Amino acid sequence: MADTQYILPNDIGVSSLDCREAFRLLSPTERLYAHHLSRAAWYGGLAVLLQTSPEAPYIYALLSRLFRAQDPDQLRQHALAEGLTEEEYQAFLVYAAGVYSNMGNYKSFGDTKFVPNLPKEKLERVILGSKAAQQHPEEVRSLWQTCGELMFSLEPRLRHLGLGKEGVTTYFSGDCAMEDAKLAQDFLDSQNLSAYNTRLFKVVGQEGKYHYEVRLASVLNTEPALDSELTSKLKSYEFQGNHFQVTRGDYAPILQKVVEHLEKAKAYAANSHQEQMLAQYVESFTQGSIEAHKRGSRFWIQDKGPIVESYIGFIESYRDPFGSRGEFEGFVAMVNKDMSAKFERLVASAEQLLKELPWPPAFEKDKFLTPDFTSLDVLTFAGSGIPAGINIPNYDDLRQTEGFKNVSLGNVLAVAYATKREKLTFMEEEDKDLYIRWKGPSFDVQVGLHELLGHGSGKLFVQDEKGAFNFDQETVINPETGEQIQSWYRSGETWDSKFSTIASSYEECRAESVGLYLCLNPQVLQIFGFEGTDAEDVIYVNWLNMVRAGLLALEFYTPETANWRQAHMQARFVILRVLLEAGEGLVTVTPTTGSDGRPDARVHLDRSKIRSVGKPALERFLRRLQVLKSTGDVVAGRALYEGYAAVTDAPPECFLTLRDTVLLRKESRKLIVQPNTRLEGSEVQLVEYEASAAGLIRSFCERFPEDGPELEEVLTQLATADAQFWRDQVQEAPSGQA
């Protein structure tokens, strides 16, 4: 059997996303709006398969073929007859549920490959003897031949997502390395093109020069587009001795489906902001224009407090090894009014709370742009995983001048809260009951502060294309050096493009630190309804949760390459290091032996020292993070952040040794089953599924009732068209592939 790092266990937690009550409260028009936006999101989410690994689209197509012909219970009878044990068949169901849940065969949280936990020969017998194989023998055999080896392979390079020799990525062709990514970013910056909706393909030309294709995601390919700002950029360039060609049409047939449903949703929009937003999204996905997506995002920001909230596009850059290309995601959710009222009170206090942050006023935005902050119950979240909170859009220029929205996903948090006492690793016994009682409320506080005042705070110092600065060069002083500002962002540079590989994690660390820092403020806790000893317990559990998460984070570190695979977990490890460095017994991590005789560890947080030792340490660290971010000082920023993120076996903690203990006792993240919406006449029905691997599989089998086989064919054709770029990793699909 495979190393447990690379399998999903049979007893993995599976939870259903509960949004029945929120959906019931929608009007018929709101339901139709939500339905078409959900359809757009689910179709677009299929692009993530093409953004993850060369084999992911084939695995998805194969699984979908199998379970459309026989549901999990029917296939079980066949599998047992073929000689599988109940455990082996359950392992296959869990694997399939994992592929659907992550939109690929790499975990969305940690970027680690997972493989089926049963012998390959047995799975082959099930697949080739299945009803799907009887109905379409050539197609099913062909799919299996294309992805079977890669489905199980744990060759070192294939174990993680990464660039070049570090791992697998389909954002770049297989022969690209970090130098190519940097060169491409310089090229994109020179043309004022965003990387968010691009992929990079490299070939060696006849004269030995490298040829790079920058391919934009769009419905249109070579067709001329009238009045598009992109048309003039779709051409060949010579740049630093290399040939670049800007093309478009990536994921075209998938985005065509997205556009069709966005157009349908427009008919049920609640106001002109929503109509204009959707029109710009249609333009963006049709043309491949990030500028159009920015315009849509501007209308989205202006659409305050809608009943049905949504966002869609190439958004988060966590999984691009370089950190600037966005993964497709789309969500649709309904407002939870009770929790939203608390967040609105937090927004009302935000200007006052921003003044509490440990940097000078010049490092804060000139004007606080009052954002929306709502608690939402998710109906649909398509992509590779579901976060607990979001602060979007990610476009720096919009965030600085137009503002943003904060979203806390209430029914996702409810799934995360559900913690069994026996699963609480690395904690003192006396902390466990307190933790179970206060984890939910403390997480609400942390998510609120993290999104609104973490991601929502701070200013970037920018010199625009005309040479004008957005800060006073004469009077603004760097509090770390006592000197005038020496560095800033030039026109075309963004946080992601400048800080690239550390940008996501550094920013998550800043936001998490703001949450820890401001949760000490009594005014914040009163907003959420906590005073006296309850408030102190919320603070303690919030800080304890963070330092424990810092230890759990070691699961997401790869010693062989010295790489972190998950931005949030790297951030939490960095915070643990900062608080350990503060000393005075504030935090200790002690190796122990568990009651089972195996290695264990205990995290201890001295609650009496949170304010006296923890707060000043966090204050110093936060100020440094913000100053280096504001000034775009990537050299010092990288040195600071990578210094704290280094994992060594230096005493007293011996983190590399502790990592083995963390892996020994790790808990897999839950899989989440989402409902479907179904249009029956002019009414939209909510279709729910049981919280099990089989339920998750059924939800996906019923997700594309009209065009499932067509979509699978589209996905495999798109994957096959680009298979040559990963020839050393993937065998090209045989002809006749469906």
Curated annotation (Swiss-Prot):
Modified residues (N-acetylalanine): 2
Catalytic reaction(s) noted: Release of an N-terminal dipeptide from a peptide comprising four or more residues, with broad specificity. Also acts on dipeptidyl 2-naphthylamides
Bilayer-crossing regions: none
Pfam families the UniProt entry points to: Peptidase_M49
Cofactors (names): Zn(2+)
UniProt remark on cofactor binding: Binds 1 zinc ion per subunit.
GO annotation, biological process: protein catabolic process; proteolysis
UniProt KW keywords: Acetylation, Aminopeptidase, Cytoplasm, Hydrolase, Metal-binding, Metalloprotease, Protease, Zinc
A GO CC annotation given for this chain: cytoplasm
EC number: 3.4.14.4
Active-site residues, Swiss-Prot/TrEMBL: 451
Effect of residue 450 to Y: Loss of activity and zinc binding
Chain residues that bind Zn(2+): 450, 455, 508
Gene Ontology MF term list: aminopeptidase activity; dipeptidyl-peptidase activity; metalloexopeptidase activity; zinc ion binding
Regulation: Inhibited by spinorphin, an opioid peptide derived from hemoglobin.
pH-activity profile: Optimum pH is 9.0.
Localization per Swiss-Prot or TrEMBL: Cytoplasm
Family that this chain belongs to: Belongs to the peptidase M49 family.
Cited function: Cleaves and degrades bioactive peptides, including angiotensin, Leu-enkephalin and Met-enkephalin. Also cleaves Arg-Arg-beta-naphthylamide.
Protein name, entry field: Dipeptidyl peptidase 3
Source organism (scientific name): Rattus norvegicus
Gene that this polypeptide is encoded by: Dpp3
